């Protein structure tokens, strides 16, 4: 499971000209799921994200987590994070899970984030053509791959 985490001052997801998710200060998380992902990946990754200290404290040191600041989260599925670009110029998405595998894992990931954050997590709609808007705060953008634990 690969994620791109962006610290935002606000973010939203629009589908067919309708805003389906919107947050203020918090995290926008893009998630790409592969066939070998499982609950262990979800548990490790959600704990890492919730406890990641990327928000500034009163001394302007990145020492606070999204939970510490009572921040919000939007999660957006993005199979293109699993792109393979080694051969040629057209990315291959063969590593990306098919919806029948990815959707339950995606839902479990969102549910685990909600449990650890202690509140509802906003989401896009899996597989939809989404317009994602954000104001990146910092900018702070972090990429994590659960397979490498980094």
Curated annotation (Swiss-Prot):
Can you tell which superkingdom this protein's organism belongs to?
Bacteria
Q: Which GO terms describe its biological process?
A: D-amino acid catabolic process
The membrane spanning regions, by residue number, are none
Q: Which Gene3D superfamilies match?
A: D-tyrosyl-tRNA(Tyr) deacylase
**Keyword tags:** Cytoplasm, Hydrolase, RNA-binding, tRNA-binding
In which residues does the motif Gly-cisPro motif, important for rejection of L-amino acids occur?
A: 138-139
Localization in the cell: Cytoplasm
Question: What's the Enzyme Commission number for this chain?
Answer: 3.1.1.96
**What's one Pfam family here?**
Tyr_Deacylase
Q: Name one GO cellular component term.
A: cytoplasm
Q: How does it assemble?
A: Homodimer.
Q: What's in the domain note? A: A Gly-cisPro motif from one monomer fits into the active site of the other monomer to allow specific chiral rejection of L-amino acids.
Q: Which family does it belong to?
A: Belongs to the DTD family.
Q: What is this protein called?
A: D-aminoacyl-tRNA deacylase
- Gene source species: Flavobacterium psychrophilum (strain ATCC 49511 / DSM 21280 / CIP 103535 / JIP02/86)
Organism classification: Bacteria, Pseudomonadati, Bacteroidota, Flavobacteriia, Flavobacteriales
């Amino acid at each position: 499971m690969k994620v791109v985490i962006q610290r935002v001052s606000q973010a939203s997801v629009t589908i067919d000209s309708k805003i389906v998710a919107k947050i203020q200060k918090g995290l926008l998380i893009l998630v790409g799921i592969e066939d070998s992902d499982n609950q262990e990946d979800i548990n490790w990754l959600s704990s890492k994200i919730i406890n990641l200290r990327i928000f500034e404290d009163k001394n302007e040191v990145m020492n606070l987590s999204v939970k510490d600041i009572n921040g919000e989260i939007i999660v957006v599925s993005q199979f293109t994070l699993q792109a393979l670009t080694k051969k040629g110029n057209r990315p291959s998405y063969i590593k990306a899970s098919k919806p029948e595998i990815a959707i339950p894992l995606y839902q479990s990931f969102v549910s685990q984030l909600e449990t650890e954050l202690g509140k509802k997590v906003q989401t896009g709609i899996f597989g939809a053509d989404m317009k994602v808007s954000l104001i990146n705060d910092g900018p702070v953008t972090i990429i994590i791959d659960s397979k490498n634990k980094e």
